[in-house]
């Protein structure tokens, strides 16, 4: 029996007395809260940084989208212009009148050395 009391005495010596237990728990709790506060602050900073990055990316994409819409509008106008030029040229063109219907690539390649009947500033050197 004395042996068992020694072991129980040694177990009491391993854990701090009740007053010290409370203060060490308090210290751990304060440390854990501080660590958690810092982790939460870092998480909020990362979230803010991510939102800022997404906002800048969104603005950049909006600018690209506006530029592409402007280019589409310009190309559509150019297409209308060239379609109009082609339509006004077809009745005057002897190459088109003499040829049989063929794919557009062939018709346009026949025009490679043909002088355009266009007096537009676009075609002026």
Curated annotation (Swiss-Prot):
Which residues are in the bZIP domain? 26-89
Q: Where in the cell is it found?
A: Nucleus; Cytoplasm
Induction details: Up-regulated by PDCD1 following infection by HIV-1 virus, leading to inhibit T-cell functions and exhaust T-cells. Up-regulated by Epstein-Barr virus (EBV) protein EBNA2 following infection by EBV.
What GO molecular function terms would the record report? DNA-binding transcription activator activity, RNA polymerase II-specific; DNA-binding transcription factor activity; DNA-binding transcription factor activity, RNA polymerase II-specific; RNA polymerase II cis-regulatory region sequence-specific DNA binding; sequence-specific DNA binding; sequence-specific double-stranded DNA binding
Q: In terms of domain of life, where is this protein from? A: Eukaryota
Q: Which UniProt keywords apply?
A: Activator, Cytoplasm, Differentiation, DNA-binding, Nucleus, Phosphoprotein, Repressor, Transcription, Transcription regulation
> Subunit composition?
Heterodimer; mainly heterodimerizes with JUNB. The BATF-JUNB heterodimer interacts with IRF4 and IRF8. Interacts (via bZIP domain) with IRF4 and IRF8; the interaction is direct. Also forms heterodimers with JUN and JUND. Also interacts with IFI35.
Q: Which CDD domains match?
A: bZIP_BATF
> What is this protein's record name?
Basic leucine zipper transcriptional factor ATF-like
Q: Name one GO biological process term.
A: DNA damage response
Q: What is its main location?
A: nucleus
Q: In which organism is this protein found?
A: Homo sapiens
GO terms for cellular component: chromatin; cytoplasm; nucleoplasm; nucleus; RNA polymerase II transcription regulator complex
Q: Which residues carry this modification: Phosphothreonine?
A: 48
Instruction: Indicate where the modification Phosphoserine is found in the sequence.
Output: 43
Describe PTMs of this protein: Phosphorylated on serine and threonine residues and at least one tyrosine residue. Phosphorylation at Ser-43 inhibit DNA binding activity and transforms it as a negative regulator of AP-1 mediated transcription.
The taxonomy runs:
Eukaryota, Metazoa, Chordata, Craniata, Vertebrata
Extract the InterPro entries matched here. Answer: AP-1 (IPR000837), bZIP (IPR004827), bZIP_sf (IPR046347)
């Amino acid at each position: 029996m004395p042996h068992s009391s020694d072991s129980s005495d040694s177990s009491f010596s391993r854990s701090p007395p009740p007053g010290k237990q409370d203060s060490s728990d308090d210290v751990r709790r304060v440390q854990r809260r501080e660590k958690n506060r810092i982790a939460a602050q870092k998480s909020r900073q990362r979230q803010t940084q991510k939102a800022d990055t997404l906002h800048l990316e969104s603005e950049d994409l909006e600018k690209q989208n506006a530029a592409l819409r402007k280019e589409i509008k310009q190309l559509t106008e150019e297409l209308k212009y060239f379609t109009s030029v082609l339509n006004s040229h077809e009745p005057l063109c002897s190459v088109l009148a003499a040829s049989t219907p063929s794919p557009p690539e062939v018709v346009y390649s026949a025009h490679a050395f043909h002088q355009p009947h266009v007096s537009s500033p676009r075609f002026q050197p």
